[in-house]
Amino acid sequence: MRLRVLGCSGSIGGQQNRTTSFLVDQDILIDAGTGVGDLSLAELTLIDHIFVTHSHLDHVNSIAFFLDSVGALRPKPVTVYATRPTIGALKRNLFNWDIWPDFTVIPTPEQPWLRYEEIEVGSVIALNGRRITVLPAIHTVPAVGYQLDSGKASLVFTGDTGPNDALWSVVNRIENLKFLIIETAFSDKDRELAKLALHLCPSMLADELAKLTRPAEIYITHLKPSEIELTMQEIDELPGDLRPRPLQNNHVFEF
């Protein structure tokens, strides 16, 4: 499997800050933040599957524009995989005809551009030899993470999450774990806000990584554009030997 980072920032501002989206091989998106807009029409047309972690706008906004751009160019609908609460939020708050058209009935209900597939924690979706497993996350709205397993190695993406014991009990059983992408949305000066928002800050990240019992290359995502240097400095000063690195746009993982 090949994962290319299209966006990994907590927000926008500057040429390199795109919100969360990862392109897996040519046909899968993990979340659909603003980074999707950097793909060409030809690349967009190849995407058949979108796996959504949760309903917050920085993770779903480009689904709307993506469908508008390429829906008519594709022979079949795009499948959005999400939990029941997330699908409900997308239907109520985005594809509701007030904010954006409902592409599950466009151009016709029989041949739409969009279809939903409901998933839950523990679901395993097999796509041409690739396995995507839904992982638990703890956030202010119902949320999940994902394990991507090529058969040779696995990459875990936590999605947006606060402290999450349930995640580590699953991750520590992944024998072929190679990469871990984990969020750290706040610096330690905003620890109380991180706790309230169910995100992580560096000191909380350290507590979470202490629960990891398997070796993995660790990358930090969802950094706020105004606090990248401060937050990474705090992470670099954490005790231990894990040495997480900041995720970057266009970073490619092969596994």
Regions found by a protein language model. Give the residues of each.
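Short amphipathic alpha-helix with an adjacent loop that forms part of the alpha/beta core around
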Residues: L39-L44, I125-N128, W168-R173, F255
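Active-site catalytic pocket residues across diverse enzymes, especially alpha/beta-hydrolases
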Residues: L67-V70, L94, V171-I174
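Active-site metal-binding motif and surrounding structural segment of the metallo-beta-lactamase
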Residues: V36-A82, L177-K178
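Cap/insert and terminal regions of metallo-dependent hydrolase folds
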Residues: N164-E254
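Divalent metal-coordination and catalytic microenvironments
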Residues: L3, F22, I30-D31, H54, ...
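Conserved beta-strand hairpin/beta-sheet module of binuclear metal-dependent hydrolase folds
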Residues: M1-E43, V144-G159
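Active-site neighborhood of phospho(di)ester-bond hydrolases with catalytic His/Asp-centered motifs
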Residues: I30-G33, D48-D58, Y81-T83, V156-T161, ...
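Metallo-beta-lactamase
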Residues: P85-A143, G240-E254
